Amino acid sequence: MQTLNTTSLKIVDNQLWILDQQALPQEKCWRPCPDVASLVEHIQTLRVRGAPLIGLSASLLLALLAEKGLSQAELAQALETLRASRPTAVNLMNNLDRMKLALAQPQFVAALVQEALRLVEEDRALCERIADHGAALVKPNSRLLTHCNTGGLATAGIGTAIGVLLRAHQQGKVTQVWVDETRPLLQGGRLTAWELGELGIPYQLICDSMAASLMAQGQVDAIWVGADRIAANGDVANKIGTYSLAVLAHYHQIPFYVAAPHTTHDPACPDGRAIPIEQRAAAEVTGVSGSFGHCQWAPQNAAVYNPAFDVTPAALISGWVLDTGVVTPQDVKEGIFQNTLK
């Protein structure tokens, strides 16, 4: 396969490498990904994260394994193993559905390679269109708040919600970005703060619990988040803490926007109650680990509830900003998400 470079994925000498997002920002560490077991581990430990990126990494690995000579039966098994690695992120399922169709072709090796590379290029283009649509909604001198990480680290392009912030910044509209640290794994503090700094976008990092105070003071003009799955009724699954922000935004009458590619939409999922929510290890809440080391602050035997995602009801969302355009609450009431988006 040809050499490929994105912010978080690269292919060099027919080997997939992933940027270890658990090591950032202290260390920029690229890790090899030679087989399915290694990628599943990288996904489940969040070295690879972000709904679009998870789907792309799985697709690229399948194509590389096909080039290395795995049979159709072996690739089919690999595909299903990868499908089970992160149940909430529907981009993974959608990408693998397309790779499964390619695998059924007589010339399946070439078909898999072509489809994987097509998915990467499509994602780059999707990000650009999301940014354009979203930036049109950003008013001059805006102070924006974002949650988790939705930039180039999570996609093949400039990102979803962060892509909107970047485009609006390039247009001179952004005064300030408030970055939620995003407990328990600190994707906002570790990743979004790093990305915004690299992009030259002015930001300030806050604890998640500080967002309400900022809104009450009139310091937030709009909230921009990403999505891991959009249900047929417009409900959105995203990083835990997103729902809290949506409730706060609704109370303070602040626009709350979801930026995502149309591939995050799942018309087969009727509403948020049908979205599987991944439960993660207690150690993520009782302490913290990273390239900086490990610290535990809770009692060793503390009982922990640690869902990776929550669901924001459609009624709390001001707009779904997709590559296909901006979906309004009225569009949702009329059933736009009931069918496949194109």
UniProtKB/Swiss-Prot annotation:
Kindly state which keywords UniProt assigns to this record, in alphabetical order.
Answer: Amino-acid biosynthesis, Isomerase, Methionine biosynthesis
Q: Which residues form a coiled coil?
A: none
Q: Name one GO biological process term.
A: L-methionine salvage from methylthioadenosine
Tell me if Metal-binding is a UniProt keyword of this record: no
Give the pathway listed in the UniProt entry for this protein.
Answer: Amino-acid biosynthesis; L-methionine biosynthesis via salvage pathway; L-methionine from S-methyl-5-thio-alpha-D-ribose 1-phosphate: step 1/6
Q: Where is the active site?
A: 228
Q: Which Gene3D superfamilies match?
A: translation initiation factor eif-2b, domain 1 (1.20.120.420), Translation initiation factor eif-2b, domain 2 (3.40.50.10470)
One Gene Ontology MF term: S-methyl-5-thioribose-1-phosphate isomerase activity
| Pfam families to which the protein is assigned, alphabetical | IF-2B (PF01008)
What residues does the record give for site: Transition state stabilizer? Answer: 148
As recorded in UniProt, its EC number(s) are 5.3.1.23
Is Secreted one of the keywords UniProt gives this record? no
Which reactions are catalysed by this chain? 5-(methylsulfanyl)-alpha-D-ribose 1-phosphate = 5-(methylsulfanyl)-D-ribulose 1-phosphate
User: What does the entry list as the binding residues for substrate?
Assistant: 49-51, 86, 187, 238-239
Which HAMAP family has this protein been placed in? Salvage_MtnA
Q: Which family does the record assign?
A: Belongs to the eIF-2B alpha/beta/delta subunits family. MtnA subfamily.
Q: Name the job this protein performs.
A: Catalyzes the interconversion of methylthioribose-1-phosphate (MTR-1-P) into methylthioribulose-1-phosphate (MTRu-1-P).
- Please state what the protein is called: Methylthioribose-1-phosphate isomerase
Q: Which organism is it from?
A: Pectobacterium carotovorum subsp. carotovorum (strain PC1)
What lineage does UniProt assign to this protein's organism? Bacteria, Pseudomonadati, Pseudomonadota, Gammaproteobacteria, Enterobacterales
